[in-house]
């Protein structure tokens, strides 16, 4: 394992295993966030409920320095009575790809490959239909085939609001169980953080106050689309004045 880890170059994503398995995915992510957020801004923490992936997680930092410090200090740390085993991840995460601008290139490559595969499959299907038609007595020499164009995957991209800079941030698309303590842990990583205001009358939104709009803008950039839970990327905007 040590030889394999040494062969992997340092990067922003850490692979963590030997974790306690009898803990919910939500609780695991919350606990890992508490432990690792002190090393630097975290873009994403990925866990899984599947039997194959139990006891494992991926922690995506914004920069390599933060990930390296976390690996050095937390590898072997006794977490829920089990020593964590940490190494750099072999491949770049989508979160990091979005940050450095290579995500869309990867996405286009995947879409092009999927489209090529789909076109080949459709061509084979059309050829087979034509051959079947031609075998029938009295069948026309050619047939017209109609296919539906390939649509996108339907994923909704939540965009931040286009409001002028403000020292207060408006955060939405939060999971219902997200509370002020969780948000304080996230945003207190950034200089100038003051306090969190939860909106009790409406779940899923909150206001985060900073000393000035420069500090709030830095926090917004770093935590934009951070996944508090795997299915809930939060959307951060300047609050309307």
Swiss-Prot record:
What are the subcellular locations of this protein? Nucleus
SMART domains from the xrefs?
RRM (SM00360)
- Domain of life, per lineage: Eukaryota
Output the GO biological process annotations, alphabetical, semicolon-separated: mRNA splicing, via spliceosome
Q: Where is the composition biased (Basic and acidic residues)?
A: 99-126
Q: Where is the composition biased (Low complexity)?
A: 129-152
**One matching Pfam family:** RRM_1
Q: Which UniProt keywords apply?
A: mRNA processing, mRNA splicing, Nucleus, Repeat, Ribonucleoprotein, RNA-binding, Spliceosome
Family as reported in the entry's similarity comment: Belongs to the RRM U1 A/B'' family.
Q: PANTHER family per the record?
A: U1 SMALL NUCLEAR RIBONUCLEOPROTEIN A/U2 SMALL NUCLEAR RIBONUCLEOPROTEIN B
Positions of the RRM domain? 12-91, 167-241
Which molecular-function annotation in GO is an example for this chain? U1 snRNA binding
Protein name stated in the entry? U2 small nuclear ribonucleoprotein B''
In this chain, the stretch annotated as Disordered covers 99-169
Summarizing the function annotation, the protein's role is: Involved in pre-mRNA splicing as component of the spliceosome. Associated with sn-RNP U2, where it contributes to the binding of stem loop IV of U2 snRNA.
Instruction: Give the record's subunit note.
Output: Identified in the spliceosome B complex. Identified in the spliceosome C complex.
> Per the UniProt entry, what species is this protein from, by scientific name?
Dictyostelium discoideum (Social amoeba)
Q: Does the keyword Transmembrane helix apply?
A: no
The main location class comes to nucleus
| Record's GO cellular component terms | spliceosomal complex; U1 snRNP
């Amino acid at each position: 394992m040590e030889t394999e880890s040494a062969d992997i170059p340092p990067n922003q994503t850490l692979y963590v295993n030997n974790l306690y398995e009898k803990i919910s995915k939500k609780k695991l992510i919350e606990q890992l966030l508490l432990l690792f957020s002190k090393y630097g801004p975290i873009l994403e923490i990925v866990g899984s409920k599947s039997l194959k992936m139990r006891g494992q997680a991926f922690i995506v930092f914004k920069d390599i320095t933060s990930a390296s410090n976390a690996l050095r200090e937390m590898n072997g740390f006794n977490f829920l009575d089990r020593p964590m085993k940490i190494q750099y991840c072999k491949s770049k995460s989508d979160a990091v790809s979005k940050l450095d601008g290579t995500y869309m290139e990867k996405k286009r490559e995947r879409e092009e490959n999927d489209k090529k595969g789909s076109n080949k499959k459709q061509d084979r299907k059309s050829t087979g239909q034509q051959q079947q038609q031609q075998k029938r007595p009295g069948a026309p020499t050619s047939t017209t085939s109609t296919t539906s164009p390939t649509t996108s995957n339907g994923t909704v991209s939540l965009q931040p609001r286009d409001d002028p800079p403000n020292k207060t941030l408006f955060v939405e698309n939060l999971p219902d169980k997200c509370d002020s303590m969780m948000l304080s842990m996230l945003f207190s990583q950034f200089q100038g953080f003051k306090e969190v205001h939860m909106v009790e009358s409406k779940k899923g939104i909150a206001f985060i106050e900073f000393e000035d709009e420069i500090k709030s803008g830095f926090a917004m950039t770093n935590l934009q689309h951070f996944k508090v839970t795997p299915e809930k990327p939060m959307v951060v905007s300047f609050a309307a004045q």
